[in-house]
């Protein structure tokens, strides 16, 4: 390609679609053609000095332009990065998916797993840390709730950073903070050092802000139109698996013993393991993460490149989102469901120990059952959405079944049969945890082409707010009245969420963007392949696509 810097005074010339340029047969395709005898140039192409256009114009070296051509000068090339949206969805647009996308979503899932483990590692053995640090149950609850509290004020700055600096910067920052927080906790292995473990947990909670809004963004930027829901489910899958491991591993690594020195030793093993894993994942993020693939993976993503502008008002995007009634309803309903899950996860150990004293390990296994079942629910619902596109219907059914599962769990917990609790926890988790990625994807559909980082961030703020309210309220109800009234409290709000979900309209804007454009075969990108075919005019891509 030959890049010519042309006169700026004609920079406002209308950019003509590449199809016009290729169709004009008055342009010679013979190499080494001189355009005007008085003008000399590159051996393979000469350009008359009167031809002007936008800066950084890409011109195929095999094309020469005769001054007598009747075409407008701006048809000679497509300005770099200044393509109209309707031109981006023409038939010859390059739409490819990158093989790297699987590595990106896998690494993200792993460090999201690590961060989620650190969130629940205290709550899953609440009574053991109470005895070790000599603090109240409410103080240990704050090791969980600090994740929720930190997210609320930091959402908008981090979402702005995601738009400003992109996926790679946010991923590196989140994994670095996650690693730092894990190592800080190693300085809290004495009973009087509870403030140090709180500082480490707060650092990890800040890392979470750089993680929770990423799944839908990664899915949209890296995956094709028929993969986005599955990819989003895979990204959320890591966070859920981290919670599952956080329920299972701490009760095994840290037994309920009275000897403080031995207890400190067991806690240190857990902290060292998580510190080493967090460090390894930080290195992998640096190696694997790229800002975006070489080519857009879908027409909707290609169009979003065109609509994105550097001077776009970030606050105006948020204002537009809150004017979208369907999205506002989803924010509320998502917060109610996810907030109930956060409260249930935080207080699960306390509820199980109340009915089954000395069963810390089984309390962790019940939590594991809830999350593992939810992971299967998330994957199944993600695959179903990619096939059926029934976002509203699927979300509503899953929400109602979450309510049913919570009611059954509530009234079987006090039957004093542990195997029944495992069964009801499994059914509850399948729908309650499986709902989380549905909310992300439904939000992107309702708000397209607004930023996925902003929409998913607002969903998470709602989840954190309701999570704090529900955790504190249910904790007080359990302490004063028992587990059944505490769980009924959550059932009431899940019923409200189910009713509100029914009023959300199925306005699938991203699906319309993909369907409105002509079909293009999505190819698998061969990243190592060099573009060696210069015998024909290639599709011109703006620099934003590379």
Swiss-Prot record:
Span list, region Disordered: 1-84, 511-546
UniProt repeat feature Sequence, residue ranges: 31-36, 37-42, 43-48, 49-54, 55-60, 61-66, 67-72, 73-78, 79-84
Comp. bias (Low complexity): 54-74
Basic and acidic residues compositional bias, start-end: 511-523
Entries under SUPFAM superfamilies matching the protein: MFS general substrate transporter
Annotated membrane topology: Multi-pass membrane protein
Gene Ontology terms: biological process: brain development; choline transport; endothelial tip cell fate specification; gene expression; heme export; in utero embryonic development; sprouting angiogenesis; transport across blood-brain barrier
Modified residues (Phosphoserine): 535
Subcellular localization, as worded in the UniProt entry: Cell membrane; Mitochondrion membrane; Endoplasmic reticulum membrane
Alphabetical list of Pfam families matching this protein: MFS_1
Biased composition, class Polar residues, residue ranges: 22-49
InterPro entries associated with the record: FLVCR1-2_SLC49-like, MFS, MFS_dom, MFS_trans_sf
GO molecular function: choline binding; choline transmembrane transporter activity; ethanolamine transmembrane transporter activity; heme binding; heme transmembrane transporter activity
PROSITE patterns with a match to the protein in the record: MFS
Ranges that cross the membrane: 94-118, 137-164, 167-186, 194-222, 228-253, 259-288, 325-355, 360-388, 391-413, 417-446, 455-480, 483-505
Residue ranges, Extracellular side: 119-136, 187-193, 254-258, 356-359, 414-416, 481-482
Cytoplasmic-facing ranges: 1-93, 165-166, 223-227, 289-324, 389-390, 447-454, 506-546
Keywords assigned by UniProt, alphabetized: Cell membrane, Endoplasmic reticulum, Membrane, Mitochondrion, Phosphoprotein, Repeat, Transmembrane, Transmembrane helix, Transport
Catalytic function, reaction form: choline(out) = choline(in); ethanolamine(in) = ethanolamine(out); heme b(in) = heme b(out)
Region feature 9 X 6 AA tandem repeats of P-S-[VS]-S-[VIAG]-[HD], mapped onto this chain: 31-84
Gene Ontology CC entries for this record: endoplasmic reticulum membrane; membrane; mitochondrial membrane; plasma membrane
Subunit structure: Interacts with components of electron transfer chain complexes III, IV and V including CYC1, NDUFA4, COX4I1, ATP5PD and ATP5F1C; these interactions occur in the absence of heme and are disrupted upon heme binding. Interacts with ATP2A2; this interaction occurs in the absence of heme and promotes ATP2A2 proteasomal degradation; the complex is dissociated upon heme binding. Interacts with HMOX1; this interaction is potentiated in the presence of heme.
Family: Belongs to the major facilitator superfamily. Feline leukemia virus subgroup C receptor (TC 2.A.1.28.1) family.
Domain notes: The N-terminus contains histidine-proline motifs involved in heme binding. Can bind 2 to 3 heme molecules.
Function according to Swiss-Prot or TrEMBL: Choline uniporter that specifically mediates choline uptake at the blood-brain-barrier. Responsible for the majority of choline uptake across the blood-brain-barrier from the circulation into the brain. Choline, a nutrient critical for brain development, is a precursor of phosphatidylcholine, as well as betaine. Also mediates transport of ethanolamine. Choline and ethanolamine transport is not coupled with proton transport and is exclusively driven by the choline gradient across the plasma membrane. However, the presence of an inwardly directed proton gradient enhances choline uptake.
Name of the protein in question: Choline/ethanolamine transporter FLVCR2
Species the sequence originates in: Rattus norvegicus
Lineage, broadest ranks: Eukaryota, Metazoa, Chordata, Craniata, Vertebrata
């Amino acid at each position: 390609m030959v890049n010519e810097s042309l006169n700026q005074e004609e920079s406002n010339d209308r950019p003509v679609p590449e199809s016009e340029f290729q169709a004009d047969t008055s342009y010679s395709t013979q190499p080494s053609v001189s355009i005007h005898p008085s003008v000399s140039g590159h051996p393979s192409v000469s350009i008359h000095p009167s031809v002007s256009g936008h800066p950084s114009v890409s011109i195929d070296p095999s094309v020469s332009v005769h001054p007598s051509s009747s075409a407008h000068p701006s048809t000679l090339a497509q300005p770099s990065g200044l393509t109209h949206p309707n031109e981006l969805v023409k038939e010859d647009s390059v739409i490819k998916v990158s093989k790297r996308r699987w590595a990106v979503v896998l690494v993200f899932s792993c460090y999201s797993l690590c961060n989620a483990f650190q969130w629940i590692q205290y709550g899953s053995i609440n009574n053991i840390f109470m005895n070790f640090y000599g603090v109240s149950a409410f103080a240990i609850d704050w090791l969980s709730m600090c994740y929720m509290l930190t997210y609320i004020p930091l959402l908008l700055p981090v979402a702005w950073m995601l738009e400003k600096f992109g996926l790679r910067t946010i991923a590196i920052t989140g994994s670095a903070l996650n690693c730092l927080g894990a190592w800080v906790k190693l300085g809290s292995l004495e009973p009087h050092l509870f403030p140090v473990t709180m500082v480490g947990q707060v650092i990890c909670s800040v890392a979470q802000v750089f993680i929770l809004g990423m799944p839908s963004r990664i899915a949209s930027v890296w995956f094709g139109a028929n993969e986005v829901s599955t990819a989003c489910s895979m990204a959320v899958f890591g966070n859920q698996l981290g919670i599952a491991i956080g329920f299972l591993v701490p009760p095994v690594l840290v037994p309920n013993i009275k000897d403080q020195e031995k207890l400190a030793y067991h806690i240190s093993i857990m902290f060292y393991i998580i510190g080493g894993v967090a460090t390894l994942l930080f290195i992998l993020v640096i190696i694997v993460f790229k800002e975006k693939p070489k080519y857009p993976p879908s027409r909707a993503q290609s169009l979003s490149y065109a609509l994105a502008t550097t001077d776009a008002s970030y606050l105006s995007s948020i204002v537009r989102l809150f004017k979208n009634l369907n999205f506002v309803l989803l924010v509320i309903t998502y917060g109610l469901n996810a907030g109930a899950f956060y409260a249930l996860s935080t207080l699960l150990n306390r509820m199980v120990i109340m009915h089954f004293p000395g069963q810390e390990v089984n309390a962790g296994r019940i939590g594991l059952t809830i999350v593992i079942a939810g992971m299967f629910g998330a994957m199944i619902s993600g695959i179903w959405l990619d096939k059926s596109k029934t976002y509203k219907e699927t979300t509503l059914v899953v929400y109602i079944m979450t309510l049913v599962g919570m009611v059954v769990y509530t009234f079987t917990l006090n039957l004093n049969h542990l195997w029944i609790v495992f069964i009801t926890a499994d059914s509850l988790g399948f729908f309650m945890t499986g709902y989380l990625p549905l909310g992300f994807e439904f939000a992107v559909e309702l708000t397209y082409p607004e930023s996925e980082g902003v929409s998913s961030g607002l969903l998470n703020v709602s989840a954190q707010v309701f999570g704090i309210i529900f955790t504190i309220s249910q904790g007080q109800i359990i302490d004063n009245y028992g587990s059944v009234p505490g769980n009924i409290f959550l059932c009431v709000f899940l019923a409200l969420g189910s009713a509100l979900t029914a009023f959300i309209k199925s306005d699938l804007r991203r699906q319309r963007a993909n369907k409105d454009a002509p079909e293009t075969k999505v190819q698998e990108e061969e990243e190592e392949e060099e573009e060696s075919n210069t015998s024909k005019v290639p599709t011109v891509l703006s620099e934003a696509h590379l």
